[in-house]
């Protein structure tokens, strides 16, 4: 049986291992979760929320345990681990408060079809397969699992093999809530286990991962028409305009590029600075990079603010992109040194869009900075990407900042900051173009785990019901007249049936009949309304 080693990227030490799931485990898990779905979907929402709040309580009580595992598993500081937990519980807290509103049945206006009542209601899909990444292995799995459960689904979770210790931790936390654990199954393993989960015919697949993996799953799910939603890679641009607070742009831009060692899907991956402030920005951003303290500490009182890359594959990508850029004429103005998985925060200039560094996702602490003539050139270059996750715009002229923000082909724009839009729990987050089609955060996150169903409720059709009249043969003229009267755009269009009726002998009896029916209908409606009011 395959095992997944837990490796601390800062020290290279192995600190445990997990058993990978077998093909039989995958089949059984999906079968079990399909049965469990019949129980969970019938639980009233308030009971589901009670169970999920117990998990929220367990997470808060287990804070030190979680940050310790994240620290060993990814090399990030305990404080950065705390940020993951904080973002998770903030989201869960908001979702549980708002879910009764988001998930409730809603009446739909009847339009012309007044003799029935109509409503729509979000229903769960069934078994949701959640496939997670390693860069924020807690925050990018736990809230997704909880949202799917909140909506009434059961879940099969396949956490990343790179951070398998966090996957085991997530499994253990869920097991501590007996009310919840029968409705989630965690399957550990690498891409093969993920592929088997997708092939196992779940009712919905949710991936957070690379665009390359998204493409593979899109192909696999197309065969079975399984719905597939994905949060994928990014190449987020930052634009610094002439009216920017350059010191703030340098400080928070550097933070956005180097936070989590650059392994953040909406981290700053490319910077475009207008020529008027380019030299000043470069001077200040280098000064900011000099302040970054690299290192690893187990203690919560650590002095470092940047750890190692999380695993070897990331190092290879960073090295390959740097070599390609340098060979094509780029210049490192700060950093560039590599020691094990520790990569210095690196600022690189003279970059062009034919370099991999400006086109492909890097996911490392590398900040390429490019001088541009003006806002127009910055926008053109920022949009010259297959990705479209987030972007950052810097200007103290809010009209200009908003104008640029609205012309960026991305899912979210942050004006005068970086990354900080992500922790806002009710602000939808997700990509356009090849950055994916999912939305996390808020109502949109929870509702994407539901399918909207519609209901038309009433007694058998009445003779004067429009739906009955339109089904009768020889009612073409009548139907056309009703359409014009009801939906005519101009007064002339609306009045046309009346004019035609007055001129058309054939139509007169029909109009008379409709007028009588309308009279009866009005009386029935008036009686029904009076009865309803009397009952109230
Ligand atoms: P990855 O694509 O390598 O792996 C993601 C998950 O998919 C892992 O669990 C992996 O085992 C699984 N997987 C791989 N191949 C599979 C297959 N054929 N079928 C089913 N499952 C398969 O991504 P990663 O390296 O773990 O994560 C980093 C990537 O995720 C980056 O591209 C990053 O931008 C992206 N990401 C996006 C967001 C977002 O919200 N848009 C957030 C975080 C990370």
Residue ranges and their predicted role:
Residues 1-117, 495-508, 517-532:
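N-terminal Rossmann-like NAD(P)+-binding subdomain of aldehyde/semialdehyde dehydrogenases
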Residues 8-17, 343-536:
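Conserved C-terminal structural/oligomerization subdomain of aldehyde/semialdehyde dehydrogenase
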Residues 12, 48, 70, 92, ...:
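Residue-level signal for inorganic ion chemistry
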Residues 15, 212-352, 381, 415:
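ALDH superfamily catalytic-core signature
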Residues 15-21, 36-42, 130, 238-240, ...:
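Short, well-ordered beta-strand elements within core beta-sheets of diverse protein domains
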Residues 37, 41, 56-59, 63, ...:
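Structural signal for hydrophobic packing residues in well-ordered secondary-structure cores
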Residues 108-248, 499-501, 514-517, 521:
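Rossmann-like NAD(P) dinucleotide-binding subdomain of oxidoreductase/dehydrogenase enzymes
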């Amino acid at each position: 049986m395959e095992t997944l080693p837990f490796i601390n990227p800062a020290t290279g030490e192995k600190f445990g291992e997990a058993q990978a799931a077998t093909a039989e485990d995958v089949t059984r898990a999906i079968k079990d979760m399909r049965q469990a779905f019949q129980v969970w979907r019938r639980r009233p929402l308030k009971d589901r929320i009670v169970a999920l709040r117990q998990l929220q309580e367990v997470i808060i009580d287990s804070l030190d345990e979680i940050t310790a595992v994240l620290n060993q598993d990814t090399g990030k500081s305990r404080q950065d681990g705390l940020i993951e937990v904080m973002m998770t519980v903030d989201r869960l807290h908001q979702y549980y408060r708002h879910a009764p509103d988001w998930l409730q049945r809603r009446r739909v206006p009847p339009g012309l079809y007044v003799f029935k009542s109509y409503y729509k209601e979000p229903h769960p899909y069934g078994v949701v397969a959640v496939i997670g990444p390693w860069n924020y292995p807690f925050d990018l799995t736990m809230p997704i699992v909880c949202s799917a459960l909140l909506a009434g689904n059961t879940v099969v979770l396949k956490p990343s093999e790179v951070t398998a210790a966090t996957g085991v931790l997530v499994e253990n936390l869920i097991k501590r809530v007996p009310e919840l654990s029968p409705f989630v199954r965690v399957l550990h393993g690498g891409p093969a286990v993920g592929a088997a989960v997708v092939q196992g015919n779940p009712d919905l697949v949710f991936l957070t991962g690379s665009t390359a993996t998204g493409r593979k799953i899109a192909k696999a799910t197309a065969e079975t028409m399984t719905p597939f939603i994905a949060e994928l890679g990014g190449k987020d641009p930052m634009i610094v305009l002439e009216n920017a607070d350059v010191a703030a742009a340098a400080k928070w831009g550097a933070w956005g590029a180097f936070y989590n060692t650059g392994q953040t899907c909406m981290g700053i991956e490319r910077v475009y600075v207008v020529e008027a402030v380019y030299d000043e920005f470069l001077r200040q951003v280098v000064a900011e990079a000099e302040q970054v303290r690299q290192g690893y500490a187990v203690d919560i009182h650590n002095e470092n603010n940047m750890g190692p890359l999380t695993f070897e594959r990331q190092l290879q990508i960073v090295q390959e992109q740097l070599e390609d850029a340098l060979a094509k004429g780029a210049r490192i103005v700060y950093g560039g040194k590599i020691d094990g998985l520790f990569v210095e925060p690196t600022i690189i200039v003279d970059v062009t869009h034919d370099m991999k560094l400006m086109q492909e996702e890097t996911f490392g602490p590398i900040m390429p900075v490019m001088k541009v003539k003006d806002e127009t050139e910055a926008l053109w270059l920022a949009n010259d990407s297959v990705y479209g996750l987030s972007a950052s715009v810097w200007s103290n002229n809010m009209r200009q900042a908003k104008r640029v923000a609205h012309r960026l082909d991305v899912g979210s724009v942050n004006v005068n900051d970086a990354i900080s839009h992500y922790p806002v729990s009710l602000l939808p987050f997700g990509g356009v173009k090849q950055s994916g089609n999912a939305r996390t955060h808020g109502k949109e996150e929870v509702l994407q785990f539901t399918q909207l169903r519609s209901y038309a409720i009433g007694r058998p059709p009445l003779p004067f019901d429009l739906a009955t009249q339109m089904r009768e043969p020889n009612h073409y003229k009548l139907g056309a007249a009703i359409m014009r009267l009801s939906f005519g755009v101009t007064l002339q269009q609306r009045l046309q049936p009346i004019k035609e009726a007055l001129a058309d002998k054939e139509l007169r009896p029909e109009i008379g009949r409709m007028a009588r029916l309308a009279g009866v209908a009005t009386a029935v409606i008036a009686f029904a309304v009076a009865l309803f009011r009397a009952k109230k």
